[in-house]
Amino acid sequence: MQRNGLCAAIQSDLEDFPAEPQLPDLPDLKGRALTIFLSCAEASGEQHAARLARELIAAAKEAGAPAPRLLGFGGAELEAAGVTTLADPGARATMDAGGAMAQLPYYRGLLETLATTCIEDRPDVFVPVDSPALHVPMASIAQRYGVPVVHHITPQYWAWAPWRVRRYKQVVDLALTILPFESAWFDRHDVPNAFVGHPIRDAHAERPAPPGPDDRDTILLLPGSRAKEIEDNLPFMLAALDAVRAAHPDVPVRITQRTADHEERVRAILGETQGVTLSIGDLEGDLGRARAALAVSGTVLTEVAHHGIPTVVLYRVTKRWKRALRSMLTVPWFSGVNLVAGEEVLPEFAVIGDGDPLPLGQALVRIYEDGPERAKIQTGLKRAMHRLGGPGAARRAARHVLGILDGRSPEREQKRTQAPTA
């Protein structure tokens, strides 16, 4: 499908879907002792899983059941939400292929742990959050032992390599979508699904954005949070600043990192670069200082959109992957914000190989300065955030998780409760 056709398909899906997700009814679970297994593989997923865990406890009580026993894969945040964690895949998260290959024995062990838990603890439902590379194989194991699977934060198969959905729909009983056009796509591929809204809106409700960024002067660089991302993106971003400095010599620039894990790497790339400050652990504060941003394509774009910050989006593509992406990519934009808006609100640049940083720098100047382009972006960001729905995604997701227990077939329940013991 050509670009115009892809744009039209997304816009049609947005028009056909209700703006606000619905709160489902609770099943009658009076007196039922439930065991629920949650899994998250990265820090961002753990935040959403922890919020979901708390809502599951509240929803079970509201449905007449005692507090459920929560088991799972995750870290300290998930434990603080009441989950007994059996391992922490987030501590092993990696993006480069060499690192992932080295971790294969660890991930194989996770699959074995899940299988053992399905046999010994007989969970009523398995709830993986995001991270399909790990969770689709896990879902297959849960299905093998008759445990229904509700996947919260569905994979973006609609963006590239959509054929992967064939395996997905075989191992997932219910997919919980977070973007307003996703449900129509999963409907077309016969995947049972429900739109619950974006979980980041729950966090936004807890910390409303400060007044708009028009009276600020800082440019924020968001190169990603992993080693490979930083090494690929940060030097290119710094080079793009040359065009900004030519127009605004004294503009303050900040690089934001959520943790100090890669502080030495960032400082090594910075070298003697002047006028750039590294900030660690204060994303919210940095967003509150920013007038404009240059960011990698990823979940952080939802945060800049929440703050109304005009942003240039960078997506680096190696020459080796260029041809493959052309054949697999099925969306007109890389950024989720643009996809939700149904148009290119944030200017996007897919840079192949070394590329030329000048166009990015020039675009950054245009959105930094007052003018029609900046105003148009800010209007589009408001529209995109409205389409994500309001807060309550975790509450809606928890009700869907409990609701699937009502529809469990006698055959599956027998398979779950009589799973092999060895």
What do the predicted segments below correspond to?
Residues M1-A422:
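Nucleotide-activated sugar donor-binding and catalytic core shared by glycosyltransferases
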